[in-house]
Amino acid sequence: MWNEFKKFAFKGNVVDLAVGVVIGAAFGKIVSSLVKDIITPLLGMVLGGVNFTDLHFGYGKSAVMYGNFIQTIFDFLIIAASIFMFIKVFNKLTSKKEDEKEEEIPEPTKEEVLLGEIRDLLKQQNSSKDRA
């Protein structure tokens, strides 16, 4: 069971996924800080000194903090746009590599074809000797 787990855990795809999750979490924190500390304060200054973190409405002790929700929407939009652009660039690069791979397969030379025929004839001769 341990060997099966090691095979699963150390496959390229699983390790790649783990690295992606860690990088994604770090990127999410960076974007959250960007939105919270830079974008929404600048937007607040443009809108006349509005502090998005304090935007809320409520009744009594209950409050709906829609300012935080607006910041979370900005987080999502920036992360979604970044992932979209990354995937677009990645797909463009991988499609170019696939095109190059398809073009790289050369036709066999006359010598290679002749050597292949000689190999096949030798195999036939050896198999007929083994039968006899």
Swiss-Prot record:
The chain crosses the membrane at residues 14-34, 38-58, 67-87. The keyword Transmembrane applies. One of its GO terms (cellular component) is plasma membrane. It is a multi-pass membrane protein. GO terms for molecular function: mechanosensitive monoatomic ion channel activity. InterPro entries: Mechanosensitive_channel_CS, MS_channel, MSC/AndL, MscL_channel. Keywords: Cell membrane, Ion channel, Ion transport, Membrane, Transmembrane, Transmembrane helix, Transport. It is found in: Cell membrane. Channel that opens in response to stretch forces in the membrane lipid bilayer. May participate in the regulation of osmotic pressure changes within the cell. Homopentamer. Belongs to the MscL family. This is Large-conductance mechanosensitive channel. It comes from Bacillus cereus (strain G9842).
